[in-house]
């Protein structure tokens, strides 16, 4: 297989090695601040385009063209770069591809950031609010400690899909160019895909494209979370362990597996997003807790339907369980992807 055709749904030892190296780099290094991240440049491009185009009339049309052109342009750019390098050195192309996979995966940093939120809460509520503001889009200045923990775990579940499973899904379908194109789509949604006065027209297509790109990965993520939860014994959902209970034994939900599936099917589509509710419902089923409620975004109040019926206090062990389960789910996804490439 020629590596420059790796945007096609084909496999081989090259893609197996590329994916494994990229994943190991993320596992060990996370997102090092000393390496410029491609998403930074995507963000600058989006900010530039939004400033130039999001004014006057026909904002929805201009936003649609901008989103589609940005995504296709990213795919073509990465494919062209890899094709150019392949003509000179397949080994160098593999190295560049592995680096881009590394940049597209965010599992290590996601788990680290969520853990830091819970650790910050031990120092004080204001510290927790500031820390969670790094990973959520909602206004955090008035959140309670319980709302800070809930926001962190909701983000963990949602971004396991956006930051790990979905990039892997598009890598399996369209190789490194597809993975990078997905990151552009996801970055567009995170920057302009809001239903407020400024973005509701210009960012409409960006939000819909992201919904389509994440439709299957979000449901795969939910299933992987539930499968990963099998490794944890049951515990009482009435636990009152304090946030600092890092030495408490780890345990899972009181719900048997078939009840978790029923929980997922009941609450997966309750979210305002067609996708975010599925991984969130899966994690809520594992923890036997409740997500959702009223949140403020850019000073405007939004209501998210509740996911779950058990409004118990979340604690430090819930974070530990969630991080481990999300890592196991990520590991399953990596193994499945490697098997696909190695066997084709």
Predicted segments with their positions:
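Hydrophobic alpha-helical transmembrane segments
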Residues: 2-180, 185, 193-344
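RNA/tRNA-interacting regions in translation and RNA-turnover enzymes
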Residues: 190
């Amino acid at each position: 297989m020629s590596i420059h055709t790796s945007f096609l749904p084909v496999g081989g030892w090259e893609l197996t090695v590329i994916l494994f190296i990229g994943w190991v780099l993320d596992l060990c290094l996370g997102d090092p601040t000393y390496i410029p991240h491609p998403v930074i440049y995507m963000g600058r491009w989006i900010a530039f385009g939004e400033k130039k185009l999001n004014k006057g009339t026909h904002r929805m049309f201009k936003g649609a063209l901008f989103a589609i052109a940005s995504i296709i342009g990213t795919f073509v750019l990465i494919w062209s770069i890899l094709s150019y390098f392949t003509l000179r050195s397949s080994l160098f192309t593999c190295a560049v591809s592995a680096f881009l996979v590394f940049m597209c995966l965010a599992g290590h940093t996601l788990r680290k950031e969520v853990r830091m939120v819970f650790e910050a809460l031990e120092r004080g509520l204001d510290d927790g609010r500031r820390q969670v503001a790094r990973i959520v889009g909602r206004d955090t200045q008035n959140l309670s400690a319980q709302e800070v923990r809930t926001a962190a775990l909701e983000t963990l579940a949602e971004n396991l899909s956006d930051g790990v499973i979905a990039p892997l899904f598009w890598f399996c379908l369209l190789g490194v160019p597809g993975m990078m194109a997905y990151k552009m789509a996801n970055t567009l949604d995170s920057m302009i895909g809001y239903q407020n006065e400024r973005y509701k027209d210009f960012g409409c297509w960006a939000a819909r494209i992201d919904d389509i790109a994440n439709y299957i990965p979000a449901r795969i993520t939910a299933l992987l979370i539930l499968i990963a939860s099998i490794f944890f014994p049951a515990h009482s959902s009435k636990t009152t362990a304090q946030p600092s209970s890092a030495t408490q034994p780890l345990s899972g939900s009181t719900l048997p597996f078939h009840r978790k599936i029923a929980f997922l099917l009941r609450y997966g589509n309750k979210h305002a997003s067609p996708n975010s509710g599925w991984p969130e419902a899966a994690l809520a089923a594992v923890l036997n807790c409740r997500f959702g409620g009223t949140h403020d975004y850019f000073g405007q109040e939004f209501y998210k339907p509740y996911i779950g019926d058990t409004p118990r206090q979340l604690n430090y062990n819930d974070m530990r369980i969630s991080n481990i389960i999300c890592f196991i789910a990520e590991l399953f996804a990596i193994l499945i992807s490697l098997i696909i490439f190695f066997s084709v």
